Every structure is written in C-alpha cells, then in structure tokens.
Amino acid sequence: MALKAFSSEVDTGSRQENAPSQSWLIVADDLTGAADCAIAFGRRGRAAAVTWGEVTDASGYRLPVLAYDAASRGLSAAAAAVRHADVLTRLCQPGRILFKKIDSTLRGQPAAETAAALAHLKSRSGPAFGVFAPAFPATGRTTIDGRILVKGRPLEEAEVWRRDHTYSNADLVDVLATAGIRGEKVKLAAVRGGDLKATFARLAGEGDVVAACDAETEHDLHLIAEASLHASPATFFIGSAGLAHALAGLEVSHAVEPLRIPTSASGTLIVVGSLAGASRTAARRLEATGTVVHFPVAPETLLNDGAGRAALAADVMERLAGGGDALVEIMMDDHPDMSLGPQLAKGLADALEAVAPAIGAFAATGGETAAALLSRFGVNGIRLADEIEPGVSLGLTLGRLSVPIATKAGAFGDEHSLIRISERLRAVRTRGSFI
C-alpha cells in the first residue's frame, strides 16, 4: 500500500478531521525517533505517519504530520548533512513547520544536521531561527545550564555516552559550535521568567542563531513551545519527543477514532537489537513471564552461519504460526563491536524475512534493527495510532505487510516495558482494534 493512499485503505470511522493550521515535517536520524515524535501529534487526533527510503517529493503526502527517517545516525557529520539537505529539498514544503528530531543523548550528528536545516531554511526564507530543547523529562532527560542530564547526572557519566558519543562534552552551545552554528543559552530562569517570548523574538530578529534551552519539566517545554512557535516565519525546532509533545499540546485536540483491523491468530514477533541495558533487562523480565519463547541469536550466526539463520527462521515461524509470541534477541558481550551494528541488522533481516507471513504483530527495540526488518518485510511506512508509554509508539505497518507495530528506542523504558508492549500488541491483534 502506498503511504500517500493509506487514509482510504484503513478504517478510521467516519470522523472528518478539523485540522489546526499547522502542518509538520519531522526529520529524524532513526526510525524510533521519527515515530515517537510523530505520535505526539497523532495521539491528539492529527493524522500522522512515518516513512523512509525513496521519496521523490511530498506532493502526494497530504498528512498534517509527516515524519521521515533519514537513517543518518551512523553517518559521518559531512554525510549526515548532505543526506538531510537532500531530504529537506524534497520534503520541506512551504507551510510545513520543520521539527529536526535529534537523539536526547546527542548520539549521531545533530549539529551537522541542524546546520543543514539552517542553511535550507535560509535559502528559502531568509535568516532562520532554531529552538533547541532536547529534554525529555518523561524518560529522565533534562537540560540545566545548557548541559544534558540523565536522571539527574551529567550525560557524560551515562551508559549511553560511554558506549557511543560524537562530541567531547554535552554542552549544547559547544555541540552546535562543532558545525559552525552560533548558539545562545536560554537558562531555566529565563524559561520560567516573564520575558521568554521577547527573548525568542530578539534572537529570531538576529537570525541564523539557535536558542539552546534549559528544561527540567514538561511544563518548561510547554513554556518554550508556546513562546517560540511564532517567533519568526523561519523558526524551526530541534529536540526529542519531549518538545514534540509540548508543541502538539498547543493545538486543539480532536477525538481519535481507533484504527480497526482484521483479527489475527498469529503470534507477535518481538526483536531486541539494542545494546542498551534497559532493553536487555526488559527482555529478561519478558522471558520470565513464560508468555514468549526466547530465541537468542549470536552475532556469529547472523554474520557467517547461513544454516543457523535458516534454522532460526524455521523455529520462529513455527512459533508464530501456532499463535505464540517469539522474542528474538541478538546476544552481545559487555564489550560489543559497535561497527558491526549495520551488518547485524542486515543479518537478522536476512534470517527473518521468511517469517513475515506468520507475523500477527511486531515490536522492535532499536531504530536500526526495526528499519532493516521492516524494509525486508516490504513495509514502507507506519500509520501511527497511540503511545503505549513515553517513547513507545503504536501503529499499523503499511505496504506488503499490514500488522500492529510497536517501536521503542533501546534506552527508553523500564524493566517492564516489553511486558506492556507484548500485552498491548496481543490485545490489538486479537480484538482487531487499537483501543
């Protein structure tokens, strides 16, 4: 199914959307990030979907909220900037507000991608103004004095930073400077003071600057969104799902008719490809419930063992076809080779491509893993329906395979997240409704 045609092919009831004036383009560096920002609008009644891959232009996408996965998390700064410039040229139509989704812990190339966004908007409408607020308080990410904290501790001390970081520190102005961007800190006192709108208006008037905003609570993000939305015609936003929820909350909410789908007797495929400790712990908890069969797979199998991959596919297909849920987990040691990520995702997609006809619902942790599998299953988009918990989006895949799907960034959630995801997907596929 073409993504642009989904509205006529999915039963959403007879409601006609009374859309607010804003339309949005969300450009993310991975799939889970694209989804958890888009659902901020989708859960408030805006038609929202995620797509990726080859998209010539946005002329056929009449959605008020379109999110695109640029798949740039693993690229160099120069390559990520080129990819974003190309995406923006094709998809950033006049009238759409740009939301540049970045990782809340600064993985990937957020500075280079932000520079590409500034350059694109400047070429189209003159000096641009960026509002940079990466905080996502619901997942423990805050920003104080222009620096990111994770659960109250400096980002530089967090597991995710030790495992993977691009910059020398987590100071937002320093990060922006690596791409030649002028940043100005807007500290918490200014966010909570009475002159925030004037501060943003001043910076927008200067142009070609990014306001790096503190935020400790969801209300702080609301204040930032409210004061900056109309700061200038060339204002754009840089942040994570926390800021997306704040911006979506400014719009009039509409009653949401739940998506309805045929019921399925096939089981749920749950794939854990993320290295984050949160996902690994959640996998152990889910396995302990006895509601899934655990299929651990070694990196060597995915890289070099064709017979092992075929055996994995046969076992997983048998489980799913019988109505049972399957938990497939890439097993890694304490010192994984991060450079193998794309190869492992491809190997897993090679192994599981054949099980697609037996899938009743699908969940994946880690954007790279999810994107590789979905592309191999013939999926070209996701129509978003709900949010299971902060950072966990629920929707319906579009393309050759149409099943309920949940996506989760690897480091989000707690030890019970996969249990909640499994239970929700089971309910959706057996009831035929996303309620």
Set out the residue ranges of the language-model regions.
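Conserved, well-ordered active-site substructure
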Residues: 360, 368-417
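Glycine-rich, highly charged phosphate/nucleotide-binding loops
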Residues: 54-55, 76-89, 344
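Short beta-strand segments
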Residues: 27, 67-69, 100-101, 131-135, ...
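C-terminal structural cap/anchor segments
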Residues: 316-365
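Conserved, well-structured core segments that form the ligand-binding/active-site neighborhood
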Residues: 149-312
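Cap/lid and interdomain-hinge subdomains that line or gate substrate/regulatory clefts
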Residues: 22-24, 47, 51, 64, ...
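Short acidic, glycine/serine/threonine-rich loops at helix termini
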Residues: 37-39, 109-113, 141-149, 198, ...
